[in-house]
Amino acid sequence: MDLISALEGLVPELEKGLDQASSLEGLEALRVDFLGRKGRIAQIMSRLPSLAPEQRPAVGQTANSVKERCNALFESRKGALKAGREAEALKRFDPSVPGRAPWSGTLHPTTLVMEEICGVFQGLGFDVASGPEVELDYYNFEALNMPPEHPARDMQDTLYITDKVLMRTHTSPVQARTMLHRKPPLAVVVPGKVYRRDSDLTHTPMFHQIEGLMVGQGINMAHLRGTLTAFVRAIFGSDTRVRFRPSFFPFTEPSAEVDMSCCMCGGQGHIDGSPCRVCKTTGWVEILGCGMVDPAVFEAVGYDADVSGFAFGMGVERVTMLKYGIGDLRMFFENDVRFLGQFAR
């Protein structure tokens, strides 16, 4: 059999193979067998040099014609197989099945809790104030009874930009700015980001605080206790117990730490006989710091000596962790949608 006959004989063989091909994968294997670099057409054409020169053009033309016919047969069969696959898929499609709702974003849990806290205090008559995150040393320290070389400055690792400019270490500078521009009576809460040179498993260089201030005539510790007790019970439940412990802050006197009954174990110190990992068996967890505003702070902002007031501050991430039982602070900063999606409203 000469080469032209061999080439022509491949077409009916291919047609038979195509009729038996039932998948795109099988079709591709057949294409490689006939048209591949080492396929059957290539094997026949490898014998072309053995022919006389005058016979080669006819064989070459036949080879090109056979390749074109084979490609046309492949494309036709490929289209038929794809159409069959799509038709089969449509048979399984049920238009009555509800569609999948697109994933919707949500506010970060820190933002949700910050808004909730501000909402509680707004209900108690407080305004919401804000101020710069890049702050002057005067407002961050000196106006809050912490002059240069004051030992209380060692309590905070500060990120300085220049000798007199820094990243605020708390939101209390906004309280000083507010008092310089407003006369009592006043009541404000100040949410925002703060920065400290601290980074480990339980601390981050940037976190969120909410600090509050109330100033007026006759403001005393009873007002402070009533306000913060109402706040804690609004966030954690009406049966939450609250206690105040003596403490020290340079801009309040007297000062106190506020503890609440553990929200994990209900203040029992244990859960089903096992020690509570949140309160470490004490039944109490620290929630915020507070105190009566030091007269030196009022003097720095030009207030009369007959006014009094209280201030308080808390870390929003800590409140969020206690409220939702989150055990790892790093989860707030990893942007894992599996975590964030749990707080969708």
UniProtKB/Swiss-Prot annotation:
GO BP annotations, alphabetical order: phenylalanyl-tRNA aminoacylation
Compartments, as annotated in UniProt: Cytoplasm
Reactions that this protein is recorded to catalyse: tRNA(Phe) + L-phenylalanine + ATP = L-phenylalanyl-tRNA(Phe) + AMP + diphosphate + H(+)
Catalytic activity, EC: 6.1.1.20
UniProt cofactor note: Binds 2 magnesium ions per tetramer.
Binding site for Mg(2+): 253
Cofactors: Mg(2+)
Domain of life: Bacteria
Heme among keywords: no
One GO cellular component term: cytoplasm
Keyword field: Aminoacyl-tRNA synthetase, ATP-binding, Cytoplasm, Ligase, Magnesium, Metal-binding, Nucleotide-binding, Protein biosynthesis
GO MF term (any one): phenylalanine-tRNA ligase activity
A family per Pfam: tRNA-synt_2d
Matches recorded under Gene3D superfamilies: Bira Bifunctional Protein, Domain 2
Main location: cytoplasm
NCBIfam families: pheS
UniProt subunit comment: Tetramer of two alpha and two beta subunits.
UniProt record similarity statement: Belongs to the class-II aminoacyl-tRNA synthetase family. Phe-tRNA synthetase alpha subunit type 1 subfamily.
The name this protein goes by in its record: Phenylalanine--tRNA ligase alpha subunit
Species: Desulfovibrio desulfuricans (strain ATCC 27774 / DSM 6949 / MB)
Lineage: Bacteria, Pseudomonadati, Thermodesulfobacteriota, Desulfovibrionia, Desulfovibrionales
Gene designation: pheS
